[in-house]
Regions:
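P-loop (Walker A) phosphate-binding loop of NTP-binding proteins
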Residues: 10
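Post-Walker A helix-loop "phosphate-sensing" segment adjacent to the P-loop in P-loop NTPases
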Residues: 24-35
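Hydrophobic anchor at the beta1->P-loop junction of P-loop NTPases
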Residues: 7
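NTP-dependent small-molecule kinase module
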Residues: 2, 21, 25, 139-171
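A glycine- and Lys/Arg-enriched "phosphate-lid" helix/loop adjacent to the NTP-binding pocket
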Residues: 96-141
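ATP-binding Walker
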Residues: 13
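ATP-dependent small-molecule kinase phosphotransfer cores
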Residues: 33-83, 87-94, 118-119, 134
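Walker A/P-loop
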Residues: 16
């Protein structure tokens, strides 16, 4: 297993924010799979979804994982929320490093994402978004838990507390 922390969880769980601080505290580099895809494809995640669809995006995610699994070491890697959904991807994640599920509750996620219009899966009226988040979490939570080596609940915690919990979990 590589010397990486791999952060998974639903959008708005804090993967990027926690990941950057964790990388800084541990002397590791930070990488974000969505950002890597944007750089490679030369278009935003939103644009990829709009132009080619979710299935195409998920294929790109899998291809990226295949590329980085044995070549990245010394990183904190923030993964797109849907990346662990494919069983094939979960196997790559395990090889990539210690998989940590940052688990936020539904109300926190909705609060954090209410003004974010860069999330292609959360377009629409507020009631529809709430129902969509609820439905997606029902499906994704068990998958995230199965994929994770450890689960860190992020609700009602400061970023520094979450980072400290991850580091303590390693000791």
């Amino acid at each position: 297993m590589a010397d990486n922390y791999v952060l998974i969880g639903y959008m708005g769980a804090g993967k990027t924010t926690v990941g950057k601080q964790l990388a800084s505290m541990c002397g590791k580099q930070f990488a974000d799979t969505d950002a890597m895809i944007v750089e490679k494809e030369k278009m935003s995640v939103n644009d990829i979804f709009a132009k080619y669809g979710e299935s195409y995006f998920r294929t790109i995610e899998t291809n990226l994982l295949k590329e980085i699994t044995d070549s990245m070491s010394g990183y904190v890697i923030s993964c797109g929320g849907g990346l662990p959904l494919k069983e094939e991807n979960r196997a790559y994640l395990k090889r990539l490093g210690k998989v940590i599920y940052l688990k936020a509750d539904e109300s926190d996620i909705i609060k954090r994402l209410k003004n974010d219009n860069t999330r292609p899966l959360l377009k629409g009226p507020k009631d529809e978004v709430r129902a969509k988040v609820h439905g997606m979490l029902e499906i994704r939570n068990p998958i995230y838990e199965e994929a994770a080596d450890s689960v860190i609940v992020t609700s009602d915690k400061k970023i520094s507390e979450i980072v400290a919990e991850i580091i303590k979990d390693e000791e």
